[in-house]
């Protein structure tokens, strides 16, 4: 059984209530911390590192499983204050951005060399980083400038979206939801709006002899967001009912 601290953890939802409760709990258990970039310190966390063998160096709620999983994945830890936290793979891109370095060769370096390079670069910058600590690991290292990044709690986004659907498209039905450490998504169908929204599409398909396909089509929306910098908060209109949902037009997006 997967543990929430594992980088590969993911879960699905069959009801909006379950998805909302999951993200409310996630928000309560998450920490957003501001630290000077030059106060951050990176250490290697693979099986050969000294930190791997000293679990007492980690923050009180960091489990042995979280340390072991990190040693198998990114292999780095961050010292925040006096405690160390494993770094999740989702934080790698934003950590490089705070150090202002990039390159395909970096992942190929030993964890000791990579940590040393990161520390040398991080020490130069006095601006702030906005750190997300979630499920026992540093999950993101965003810019601390509010112009660059704003926290948009997923549970609040879901509530706002549900209110909008109830107001504008009454009768909308939650279809499915998904969440992992990088991304959260959900989809709804709008059976009450089918006749109004799909009249033109159905007429075209029926004229082409695709009556069965026309009868299966259902308008819907797909919601996607991320706390780790993978995506903005966006809602896309969809045609559902076929094997693969079809995007209609563009999307409404709000950057974090």
What is each PLM-predicted segment?
Residues 1-160, 169:
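Feature for intrinsically disordered/low-complexity regulatory segments and propeptides
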Residues 142, 149-256:
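Intrinsic disorder/low-complexity polar-acidic segments
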């Amino acid at each position: 059984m997967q543990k929430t601290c594992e980088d590969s953890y993911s879960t699905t939802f069959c009801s909006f209530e379950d998805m909302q409760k999951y993200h409310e709990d996630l928000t309560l258990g998450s920490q957003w911390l501001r630290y000077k970039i030059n106060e951050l310190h990176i250490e290697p966390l693979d099986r050969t590192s000294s930190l791997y063998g000293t679990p007492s160096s980690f923050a009180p709620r960091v489990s042995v499983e979280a340390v072991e999983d990190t040693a198998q994945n990114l292999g780095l830890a961050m010292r925040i204050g006096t405690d160390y936290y494993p770094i999740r793979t989702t934080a790698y891109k934003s950590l490089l951005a705070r150090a202002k370095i990039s390159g395909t060769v970096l992942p190929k370096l030993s964890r000791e060399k990579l940590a040393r390079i990161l520390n040398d670069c991080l020490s130069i910058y006095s601006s702030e980083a906005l750190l997300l600590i979630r499920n026992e690991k540093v999950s993101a290292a965003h810019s601390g400038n509010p112009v660059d990044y704003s926290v948009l709690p997923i549970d609040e986004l879901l509530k706002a979206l549900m209110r909008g659907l109830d107001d504008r498209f009454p009768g909308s039905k939650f279809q499915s939801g998904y969440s992992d450490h990088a991304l959260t998504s959900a989809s709804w169908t709008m059976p009450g709006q089918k006749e109004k929204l799909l009249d033109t599409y159905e007429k075209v398909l029926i004229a082409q002899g695709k009556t069965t396909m026309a009868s299966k089509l259902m308008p819907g929306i797909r919601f996607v967001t991320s706390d780790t910098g993978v995506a903005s908060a966006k809602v896309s209109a969809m045609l559902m009912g076929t094997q693969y949902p079809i995007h209609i037009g563009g999307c409404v997006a709000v950057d974090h």
